[in-house]
């Protein structure tokens, strides 16, 4: 029991310490796994299947699944007999999903409570980042998710 708790604590810590770059890559890997299943077998992918295919700690995958649902990229549907068993399906037509669109949706989700127009510096930073995001959105390197399948 204690070793289980220690292992779980280690996993939770790992999930918090995962780099932003790695988190983005796992987000896309999870989306690819779900879309591949959706297009191949049809229907939603059980969470345990996603974890098994990616061979990543449960906590990290769960965090990312939660983020993708919050961001409106995946929908969670009950699966199997258990209350806790959940499967995931794309929330939109996979044909229209782009790599950057998914990342941007996740980055934007959450409660915005800060007014970024309060200082000149924040206003300038906001404008620069919006320009950069627009460039990424329009870039030919912003491939459709299905092009990575």
Where do the PLM segments sit?
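Pore domain of cation channels
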Residues: 1-2
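Non-catalytic alpha-helical coupling and interface elements of nucleotide-dependent molecular machines
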Residues: 5, 35, 73, 107-111, ...
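Non-transmembrane accessory domains of multi-pass membrane transporters/channels
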Residues: 6-80, 88-89
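Short, surface-exposed, charged/polar-biased interaction segments
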Residues: 51, 71, 82, 109, ...
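Short flexible coil/turn linkers enriched for glycine and charged/polar residues
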Residues: 80-84, 96
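Residue-level detector of functional hotspots within protein domains
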Residues: 83, 88, 131
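Non-DNA-binding regulatory cores of transcription-related proteins
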Residues: 91-149
């Amino acid at each position: 029991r204690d070793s289980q708790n220690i292992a779980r604590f280690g996993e939770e810590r790992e999930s918090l310490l995962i780099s932003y770059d790695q988190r983005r890559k796992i987000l896309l890997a999870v989306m690819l796994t779900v879309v591949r299943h959706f297009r191949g077998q049809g229907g939603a992918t059980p969470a345990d299947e996603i974890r098994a295919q990616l061979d990543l700690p449960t906590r990290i995958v769960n965090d990312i699944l939660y983020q993708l649902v919050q961001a409106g990229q995946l929908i969670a549907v009950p699966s199997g007999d258990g209350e806790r068993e959940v499967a995931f399906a794309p929330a939109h037509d996979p044909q229209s999903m782009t790599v950057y669109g998914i990342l941007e949706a996740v980055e934007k989700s959450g409660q915005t409570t800060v007014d970024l127009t309060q200082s000149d510096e924040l206003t300038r930073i906001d404008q620069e980042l919006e320009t950069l995001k627009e460039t990424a959105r329009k870039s030919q390197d912003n491939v459709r998710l299905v092009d990575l399948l």
